[in-house]
């Protein structure tokens, strides 16, 4: 059975039912460039950042919609005011024909309308323009402010104190050692050129004098012997007879220990007992006394 040219034309002799079946034993070979697919999935999972131009356009569109609603509201007030004025004029004409004096309620309505400013289309446009400027200022403030920094003006002095290290400490008696508000303010002329330079030179001179005095005291106290000799005498690993450190030996072996001390003792040879100098022979001169050179 073949469908659209796919499959066997007849199932006779094929050992199958003639339908195209899926081979479950087939192992699908995937492409080696699997990293590309993973990169695509990672990009799809990334959070999309909003375009600032689109967000600004959306804010301006909301501002224009608010302005349209505000203009419609003002125009409705103007139309209602005109209708009330027309009704009041008609009532005045009717009352003027019948009664010479209108009632008190109509007089109060006329006074309240005279107090309220009559709006025209030009006045409406002026009010709409003012409202637009106000909304644009609010939009600029929203751009300048950041989230989580509303109390920055309050926390800024505290951070400044922490960076400078002006922390209040309590004594045993409970008194404050350091307080920023109780510190004596520095004079205005403290950083003037002559006074500040003189004070700086005086402090540097004091520092040099103290250093020289301590140095002199140190060398006067140890002037009887050398500094290196004093270090060697205090160190146990050095001896006065030899400047080399002592040799480590096996303390469990008696023979090696005694041989080590025996080597250190002076021998009875004449070269060690007497301070005889080695005779220097001049090879250029003739031999004297039958010396064999």
Swiss-Prot record:
<dbReference type="GO" id="GO:0045292">
    <property type="term" value="P:mRNA cis splicing, via spliceosome"/>
</dbReference>
<dbReference type="InterPro" id="IPR013170">
    <property type="entry name" value="mRNA_splic_Cwf21_dom"/>
</dbReference>
<feature type="compositionally biased region" description="Basic and acidic residues">
    <location>
        <begin position="106"/>
        <end position="119"/>
    </location>
</feature>
<feature type="compositionally biased region" description="Basic and acidic residues">
    <location>
        <begin position="159"/>
        <end position="186"/>
    </location>
</feature>
<keyword id="KW-0597">Phosphoprotein</keyword>
<feature type="region of interest" description="Disordered">
    <location>
        <begin position="146"/>
        <end position="293"/>
    </location>
</feature>
<comment type="function">
    <text>Involved in pre-mRNA splicing. May function at or prior to the first catalytic step of splicing at the catalytic center of the spliceosome. May do so by stabilizing the catalytic center or the position of the RNA substrate.</text>
</comment>
<feature type="region of interest" description="Disordered">
    <location>
        <begin position="30"/>
        <end position="52"/>
    </location>
</feature>
<feature type="compositionally biased region" description="Basic and acidic residues">
    <location>
        <begin position="227"/>
        <end position="259"/>
    </location>
</feature>
<keyword id="KW-0539">Nucleus</keyword>
<feature type="modified residue" description="Phosphoserine">
    <location>
        <position position="286"/>
    </location>
</feature>
<protein>
    <recommendedName>
        <fullName>Pre-mRNA-splicing factor cwf21</fullName>
    </recommendedName>
</protein>
<comment type="subunit">
    <text>Belongs to the 40S cdc5-associated complex (or cwf complex), a spliceosome sub-complex reminiscent of a late-stage spliceosome composed of the U2, U5 and U6 snRNAs and at least brr2, cdc5, cwf2/prp3, cwf3/syf1, cwf4/syf3, cwf5/ecm2, spp42/cwf6, cwf7/spf27, cwf8, cwf9, cwf10, cwf11, cwf12, prp45/cwf13, cwf14, cwf15, cwf16, cwf17, cwf18, cwf19, cwf20, cwf21, cwf22, cwf23, cwf24, cwf25, cwf26, cyp7/cwf27, cwf28, cwf29/ist3, lea1, msl1, prp5/cwf1, prp10, prp12/sap130, prp17, prp22, sap61, sap62, sap114, sap145, slu7, smb1, smd1, smd3, smf1, smg1 and syf2.</text>
</comment>
<feature type="modified residue" description="Phosphoserine">
    <location>
        <position position="118"/>
    </location>
</feature>
<feature type="compositionally biased region" description="Basic and acidic residues">
    <location>
        <begin position="195"/>
        <end position="214"/>
    </location>
</feature>
<keyword id="KW-0963">Cytoplasm</keyword>
<feature type="domain" description="CWF21">
    <location>
        <begin position="55"/>
        <end position="98"/>
    </location>
</feature>
<feature type="compositionally biased region" description="Basic and acidic residues">
    <location>
        <begin position="43"/>
        <end position="52"/>
    </location>
</feature>
<feature type="region of interest" description="Disordered">
    <location>
        <begin position="80"/>
        <end position="119"/>
    </location>
</feature>
<dbReference type="InterPro" id="IPR051372">
    <property type="entry name" value="CWC21"/>
</dbReference>
<dbReference type="GO" id="GO:0005634">
    <property type="term" value="C:nucleus"/>
</dbReference>
<feature type="modified residue" description="Phosphoserine">
    <location>
        <position position="285"/>
    </location>
</feature>
<dbReference type="GO" id="GO:0005737">
    <property type="term" value="C:cytoplasm"/>
</dbReference>
<comment type="similarity">
    <text>Belongs to the CWC21 family.</text>
</comment>
<dbReference type="GO" id="GO:0005684">
    <property type="term" value="C:U2-type spliceosomal complex"/>
</dbReference>
<keyword id="KW-0507">mRNA processing</keyword>
<feature type="compositionally biased region" description="Polar residues">
    <location>
        <begin position="80"/>
        <end position="97"/>
    </location>
</feature>
<keyword id="KW-0508">mRNA splicing</keyword>
<dbReference type="Pfam" id="PF08312">
    <property type="entry name" value="cwf21"/>
</dbReference>
<keyword id="KW-0747">Spliceosome</keyword>
<dbReference type="GO" id="GO:0000974">
    <property type="term" value="C:Prp19 complex"/>
</dbReference>
């Amino acid at each position: 059975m073949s469908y659209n040219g796919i499959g066997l034309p007849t199932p006779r002799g094929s050992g199958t039912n003639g339908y195209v079946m899926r081979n479950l034993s087939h192992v699908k070979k995937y492409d080696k460039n699997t990293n590309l697919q993973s990169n695509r999935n990672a990009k799809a999972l990334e959070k999309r950042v909003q375009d600032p131009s689109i967000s600004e356009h959306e804010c301006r569109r909301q501002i224009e919609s608010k302005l349209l609603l505000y203009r419609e509201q003002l125009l409705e007030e103007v139309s209602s005011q005109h209708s009330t004025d027309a009704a009041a004029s008609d009532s005045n004409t009717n009352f003027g024909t019948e009664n010479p004096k209108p009632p008190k309620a109509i007089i109060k309505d006329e006074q309240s309308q005279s107090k309220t400013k009559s709006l025209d289309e030009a006045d409406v446009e002026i009010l709409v323009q003012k409202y637009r400027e106000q909304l644009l200022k609010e939009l600029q403030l929203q751009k300048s402010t950041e989230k989580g920094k509303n109390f920055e003006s309050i926390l800024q002095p505290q951070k400044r104190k922490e960076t400078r290290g002006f922390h209040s400490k309590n004594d045993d008696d409970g008194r404050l050692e350091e307080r920023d508000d109780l510190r004596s303010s520095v004079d205005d002329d403290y950083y003037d050129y002559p006074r500040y330079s003189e004070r700086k030179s005086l402090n540097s001179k004091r520092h040099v004098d103290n250093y020289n005095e301590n140095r002199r005291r140190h060398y006067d106290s140890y002037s009887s012997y050398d500094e290196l000799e004093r270090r060697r005498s205090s160190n146990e690993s050095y001896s006065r007879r030899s400047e080399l450190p002592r040799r480590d030996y096996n303390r469990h072996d008696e023979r090696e220990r005694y041989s080590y001390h025996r080597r250190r003792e002076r021998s009875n040879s004449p070269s060690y007992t007497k301070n005889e100098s080695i005779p220097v022979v001049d090879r250029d001169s003739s031999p004297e006394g039958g010396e064999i050179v």
